[in-house]
Amino acid sequence: MQSNPVEQAALAYAGTRLKQTDAPLSAETQPGGVALHVQQVIKRYDGREVLHRIELTAAPGEFVAIVGRSGCGKSTLLRLVAGLECADEGAITLDAQPARTLQQDIRVMFQDSRLLPWKRVLENVALGLPRERREEAAAVLAQVGLRDRADAWPARLSGGQRQRVALARSLVHHPRLLLLDEPLGALDALTRIEMQGLIESLWRRLGFTALLVTHDVSEAVALADRIVLIEDGHIAMDERVALPRPRQHGSAAFAQIEERVLRRVMQHTPDAEGVSQSEQEATADWSLVRTVESVRFAV
């Protein structure tokens, strides 16, 4: 798999935009990443077990991507870690403490930016901050390349700009764990790759732990230290991505990891036997990159 011209152009553009942003956030001012441990977690809905004895760890500052087919339990796991729902069995800890006691260290970024339409961009970023930290919100907005949009209304922003504001709103609280629930799924190809570069740059600079849920295997390879595959509520694969950063989408090593993960996903495709390779690849493309869907839970 070689990088196409659209990807190449997007990567070049992303690099240019990143060089233009300010850098008010730094590792020196951040608390650092948190150690995540999901221990034997079970989650049921209406008697049906969605997650079965999940064991997952993330070291402080590690970037872990979770992939899998629709309905496998990816977003459910993220909601449990975020504290939006409770596990039926098992435990989730951050730095060996119950996750519920460290909720102030967790922030979630969704596919829907969830900006308040009646507040301007800077006011959205500053939500929940004391008045004396308003300048900090402006600095973080500059960090994501939107200094000149501080007084704009959300309705005037593009999809990519709205997600940049959502990212700034998360980072202004200095999270030690950033949870990303398909935050780029509704963006066009150029904007998606640009946002990947921005997220990676800020993660490397600030050192927070990141957990990304995505249907896009290429995105997982581009961003993650490890790729975890969930199948039928179980962890079926845990692949380390041993590639130098920033990742080169068109490299042979990148393509090999991407293909290996896709093949592993396709092994579990319903009725895969007897289906041609081209049909399987088409099914994988459809199932691993989804369009916008409604958000079913509140922050």
From Swiss-Prot:
**Subcellular localization(s) per the UniProt record:** Cell inner membrane
Annotated residues for binding of ATP: G68, R69, S70, G71, C72, G73, K74, S75
Which Pfam families does this chain map to? ABC_tran
Q: What is its main location?
A: membrane
Q: What is the superkingdom listed in this entry's lineage? A: Bacteria
What InterPro entries does the annotation carry? Answer: AAA+_ATPase, ABC_transporter-like_ATP-bd, ABC_transporter-like_CS, ABC_transporter_ATP-bind, P-loop_NTPase
Q: Which Gene3D superfamilies match?
A: P-loop containing nucleotide triphosphate hydrolases
Q: Which residues form the signal peptide?
A: none
Instruction: Tell me the SUPFAM superfamilies matching this sequence.
Output: P-loop containing nucleoside triphosphate hydrolases
Q: What SMART domains does the record point to?
A: AAA
In the UniProt record, does the keyword RNA-binding occur? no
The membrane topology of this protein is: Peripheral membrane protein
Keyword annotations: ATP-binding, Cell inner membrane, Cell membrane, Membrane, Nucleotide-binding, Translocase, Transport
One term of GO molecular function: ATP hydrolysis activity
Oligomeric form and interacting partners:
The complex is composed of two ATP-binding proteins (SsuB), two transmembrane proteins (SsuC) and a solute-binding protein (SsuA).
Protein task = Part of the ABC transporter complex SsuABC involved in aliphatic sulfonates import. Responsible for energy coupling to the transport system.
Family indicated by similarity? Belongs to the ABC transporter superfamily. Aliphatic sulfonates importer (TC 3.A.1.17.2) family.
Question: Can you say what this protein is called?
Answer: Aliphatic sulfonates import ATP-binding protein SsuB
